[in-house]
Amino acid sequence: MGTYLQENQIYCGDARRLLPAIKPNSIACSVWSPPYFVGKTYEKYLKSYAAWRAMLEEVVRQHFPIIRPGGFVVINIADILCLADPNMPRFQAETVSQRRSPVTREDVLRAKALHPSYNRDQLAAFLGCSEQTVDRRLNGNNIRGGKYATQTRVKLVAGTVERWARKAGFYVYDRRVWVKDPAWQNCDWHSSSYRSVDEFEYLYFLWKPGATTVDRGRLSPREWSEWGSRGAWFIRSVRSNGDHEAKFPLELPKRVIRMLTAPGDTVLDCFIGSGSTAVAAIQTDRRYIGIDRLAKYVEMAQDACAVATHSNGTAAADEDECLARATQPSLLTAES
């Protein structure tokens, strides 16, 4: 290809169409967070779990030619906590603490033994409860999630990511856990279920075979001790995500970029969203290429980059400030 995507630009289009336009072996590290298949507005183009999986497998595959030997792809992703499964039996979950009637299943069974000819209405009158209570105690049909709703289960993503990596030619070099704020406001079941609230995600480090530079001088001794060599990264979630449904904090890509790349290297984010990865690259004197399929996020990322560039990458230009002050004219957008 004669013309490649230019560095320090954000491009609008599907990653699967634009990744082949990046110069081969030019990316030191690609760090991104894909759609999680959890029903967000920007995921509507993915009609099924199979479509989501196929899209990401293709994105990983297309990374191999553009990552330089010894470079990395770092994927921030989470398990799918509510994957609809029509084959899953209904989960029988009677929430005892929320019962409106003290009548138990044993009470109903004793009443039936005393009055075997009674129907449910007569049993309800005898027990002083509703017919629905009798039915629930006998048949266990007080189903969490609705009587007719498709049941959901947890889908672990680690094995899927590893298969994508190996098929493309990468190896899973490392994994970290991002411990974030508990998602109380986004969780409907924390008061009436054994399921846990969402408070961590993963970072999978995919390595392309080749010589890798390990430079411990990129971090201070304290940083190596506190997070560089640690498997769990404790980073607060963003303070507000009103402009984007799934922003990750600036500190997350900044740690990856500082640890795995050198100043002047090129960093890629093919799901750039609000622009956090590009801002982190600017603040650490790296170059960047960003891609997003939605024009509104491309413009948002461009504005954040303009503010970060204007601030000359100083520590004061954190992500929130960049986004709040993003009043600069948009940079060039390349339509796919």
Regions found by a protein language model. Name each.
Residues 1-18, 302-336:
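S-adenosyl-L-methionine
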Residues 1-300, 331:
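Core catalytic lobe of class I
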